[in-house]
Each structure stands twice: as C-alpha cells, then as structure tokens.
Regions:
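Signature of the catalytic double-stranded beta-helix
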Residues: 33-91, 95-98
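Catalytic core of non-heme Fe(II) oxygenases with the double-stranded beta-helix
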Residues: 87-156, 173, 183-195
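Ligand-binding loop in jelly-roll beta-barrel domains
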Residues: 162, 166-176
Length: 204
C-alpha cells in the first residue's frame, strides 16, 4: 500500500468545534466498547458545527479518487456513518473491516502511541504463508502497512481492507474520529457498475 494513498495532513483552524462535538458524542468505554458504533453514536456528520470539517474531508476524498485517475465528476461522496473512538491505555482495536461502505477514514485528534496496521492478502504470494520466509520486508512481499498516527493526521483507505491497532505503552487516551463513505453515481444510468443515485431507489 503506497503511503500517498493513505496519509495526508489536514489542519483545522478552530478545533474548538471538534471538541464540543466530542463532548456531545462521547460515551462510556470502560467496558471495552471503544467505538461510537457500539453506543448508537454514528451521526457525527450531522453536527452542523462540523460542516466545515467534513467539507475538508470531502476534498481529501476527491483527491484520493483523483490519485487513481477516477472520474470524480461521476460520483457523489456520501457520508453514511461517522463516530468517535476512545481508547484508554491497554485498549486496542481488533482486526476488522468496514463491510457497509466503500471508503473509510480516520482523523486523529489525540494520538499517543498505538500504530494503525492495514492488512491485505498479497497477490504475489505463490502459496499460503510463503512470505513468512522472507529475509527482508519490501513493498512487493508484505501484506501489512503500519502508520504511526499523529495529531491532525487523516488516513483514508478502502473499507474492505482489514485493519487494527497494535498496543504500545501509553498513559493517555487515544481519541479519533472515523467515518464511512459510499460513492453513488450522480446522474448516469447507462452503466453496470456503481450504485445508482438514491433518488432511484424504492421501497415496497
């Protein structure tokens, strides 16, 4: 996974609104449920105070699509779920992926320790676990990519990629805002691929 695909800096001039939203969206994580999803707090993107913040996220999504030479004018960028993650010392995120979206992101607010690991099966591997015998880890023989988080760092990746955090000694909370994005076609109905705009959907 190329670093240019997953990492970018995004500075917020006024972080006070982000902290105010966190005060409203925080939850009790003492029982191990460290993500807002487990508490029904998944609509942070509806907080009007954070509209400028999410517009900046959208710009980063468009840049992400542009990196792959995707015709970005074809798609609407839909924020479908966003939540805070609160990790106390000794708490980590297990291996998981986001099954309900196309693109996922995490924005680090307070970040002591705990690297994020993106994991994907390497198509170069000739047989199961072949790359457990490597002498040196390189871009073409590995199946993981480690990102050391830092404040105001935005990480974006395909939702289908498994990821987790590795524990590191720390004394403070790690707080981040994560989200899921679904791409829908803007106007086109002449293609097999891609989701049609939601206005064409119907329930019976």
């Amino acid at each position: 996974i190329d670093r240019s695909l997953v990492g970018s800096e995004m500075c917020i001039r006024d972080r006070s609104q982000l902290y105010k939203s966190f005060d409203d969206g925080k939850f009790d994580n003492s029982q191990g449920a460290i993500v807002g999803e487990h508490h029904g707090k998944v609509l942070i993107h509806h907080d009007k105070r954070l509209a400028p913040f999410f517009r900046e996220i959208k710009k980063s999504v468009v840049e992400y699509l542009d990196y792959f030479e995707i015709d970005k004018s074809t798609f609407n960028v839909n924020f479908v779920k966003t939540w805070f993650t609160i990790c106390d010392p000794q708490q980590t995120l297990p291996v998981h992926y986001h099954s309900c979206s196309h693109i996922s992101f995490v924005y680090y607010i307070q970040t002591p320790g705990d690297p994020l690991v993106l994991h994907k099966k390497n198509p170069n591997e000739w047989f199961g676990d072949a790359f457990k015998f490597i002498k040196e880890n390189r871009y073409n023989n590995g199946d993981g990519y480690v990102i050391q988080p830092k404040p105001e760092h935005l990480v974006m990746f395909p939702s289908s990629i498994e990821h987790y955090t590795t524990p590191e000694p720390r004394e403070h909370k790690r707080i981040s805002l994560a989200g899921d994005i679904v791409l829908t076609l803007k106007h086109r109905t002449d293609t097999e691929s891609g989701l049609l705009p939601s206005q064409y959907w119907k329930q019976f």
